[in-house]
Amino acid sequence: MRLPKLLTFLLWYLAWLDLEFICTVLGAPDLGQRPQGTRPGLAKAEAKERPPLARNVFRPGGHSYGGGATNANARAKGGTGQTGGLTQPKKDEPKKLPPRPGGPEPKPGHPPQTRQATARTVTPKGQLPGGKAPPKAGSVPSSFLLKKAREPGPPREPKEPFRPPPITPHEYMLSLYRTLSDADRKGGNSSVKLEAGLANTITSFIDKGQDDRGPVVRKQRYVFDISALEKDGLLGAELRILRKKPSDTAKPAAPGGGRAAQLKLSSCPSGRQPAALLDVRSVPGLDGSGWEVFDIWKLFRNFKNSAQLCLELEAWERGRAVDLRGLGFDRAARQVHEKALFLVFGRTKKRDLFFNEIKARSGQDDKTVYEYLFSQRRKRRAPLATRQGKRPSKNLKARCSRKALHVNFKDMGWDDWIIAPLEYEAFHCEGLCEFPLRSHLEPTNHAVIQTLMNSMDPESTPPTCCVPTRLSPISILFIDSANNVVYKQYEDMVVESCGCR
């Protein structure tokens, strides 16, 4: 009798272990309640292969396991405290989140956090959703840059056009302009002073050479940049070097209160071409200062197509070279008006237009020139608006005559390159050309016939125009596009008389 009872007890014990294992696997809500040492994948696979567990398991002898259906339902509702209890959560009830380690506990009266079932997209490592690669460290997303580029920023101030540093004109060029302008005002022929009345343009070039460092200077090189020189219509060239009065320490004593020295001017040797002697002259005394003028036209005719002109100066006394500094030719710390000056005289065959110089300073086409003139006009609009005086009203019944026209280059914004004059009286012609035409209007035969036809039938023939019949030139001292000071005489700048044409 004892052996059957023992076998029955063993069977009950094995059934109990098997049911507890199955209940543990099927009843765990998440990984946090799985026993240690079990693998989720294996447990799920075993759960799918096994048949569903019957609610009522009969024990031998007709007794049900766990107190029948009533005990099973009780354990399903609230038997979480019992190990191995089988619980089945409701379908509509969301799963409860387990509390995080160290996290705050839910407050009384507030429902616990729940986990909603949502579809989750798995993104490969190193890639953003949508197949985009993540930005590199330190880089800025292109969408951010594009957004910043589209955003309207603060208005930018218009940049002023680049202006070169102001050029100080040589004193000789200012003196030359005053002399020739006075001759024009006095009625004299100023062109006589310009190479036998043929030249109307003088271009000046400032020396760019420097003396060698040393206690004695026996040779000086004078260098001039002539790359921007107009090569047509050249008539002459000269070199002007200022000789200052030397100090008593630099001038040795000599009989007669002075000493005689010879100056030799030659071209600089280059390559296979040796130096060519240009001029030799004597310096009788060193008690005063003055300009040494050398005519170098014969040499310059062969070198006018070069971009640079180089000349050498030496001083000889009693058959040996002497220090040029002791003769007053020291170039150290000289001002602009004291530097050596190279002058080129010329006259172009075609009539020069003032418009060409404006074109050379502003651009290469006419459109650019007009834009330059418009910009200069806008800069001076405020000063012009504040000018005193009103323009006289037009008298349409007045006959053709010369009227005042004052030109101010400073108001036009050209005072940065025009040195003199800054203003002048140009005059203009205004009025009617009616029949009969007066003799002082100097009408042509065609103008007389046209005026007669206009008086007979105004609709078929237009009237003649009041235009300048005689114009005179003016001289202008200006800075060209290469920053060289130029004296030039421009024709047809002032109206002298008006007529009908």
Curated annotation (Swiss-Prot):
Changing S475N: In SYNS2; reduction in binding affinity with BMPR2; no change in binding affinity with BMPR1A; no change in binding affinity with BMPR1B; decreases induction of SMAD1-SMAD5-SMAD8 protein complex phosphorylation; delay of phosphotylated SMAD1-SMAD5-SMAD8 protein complex nuclear translocation; strong reduction of SMAD protein signal transduction; reduction of chondrocyte differentiation; strong improvement of chondrogenesis; decrease of NOG binding; resistant to NOG inhibition; no chondrogenesis inhibition. One of its GO terms (cellular component) is plasma membrane. The gene is GDF5. Its main location: secreted. Changing W414R: In SYNS2 and BDA1C; reduced interaction with NOG; reduces affinity to BMPR1A; impairs BMP signaling through BMPR1A; impairs chondrogenesis. Changing L263P: In BDC; no induction of SMAD protein signal transduction via BMPR1A; less induction of chondrgenesis; no phosphorylation of SMAD1-SMAD5-SMAD8 protein complex; reduction of protein level; abnormal proteolysis product. GO terms for biological process: BMP signaling pathway; cell-cell signaling; chondroblast differentiation; chondrocyte differentiation; embryonic limb morphogenesis; forelimb morphogenesis; hindlimb morphogenesis; mesenchymal cell apoptotic process. Changing Y490N: Resitant to NOG inhibition. This is Growth/differentiation factor 5. Changing R380Q: In BDA2; reduces activity; impairs processing. It comes from Homo sapiens (Human). It is found in: Secreted; Cell membrane. Residues 28-381 form a propeptide. SMART domains: TGFB (SM00204). Disulfide bonds join C400-C466, C429-C498, C433-C500. Keywords: Cell membrane, Chondrogenesis, Cleavage on pair of basic residues, Cytokine, Disease variant, Disulfide bond, Dwarfism, Glycoprotein, Growth factor, Membrane, Secreted, Signal. The keyword Membrane applies. Residues 1-27 form the signal peptide. Growth factor involved in bone and cartilage formation. During cartilage development regulates differentiation of chondrogenic tissue through two pathways. Firstly, positively regulates differentiation of chondrogenic tissue through its binding of high affinity with BMPR1B and of less affinity with BMPR1A, leading to induction of SMAD1-SMAD5-SMAD8 complex phosphorylation and then SMAD protein signaling transduction. Secondly, negatively regulates chondrogenic differentiation through its interaction with NOG. Required to prevent excessive muscle loss upon denervation.
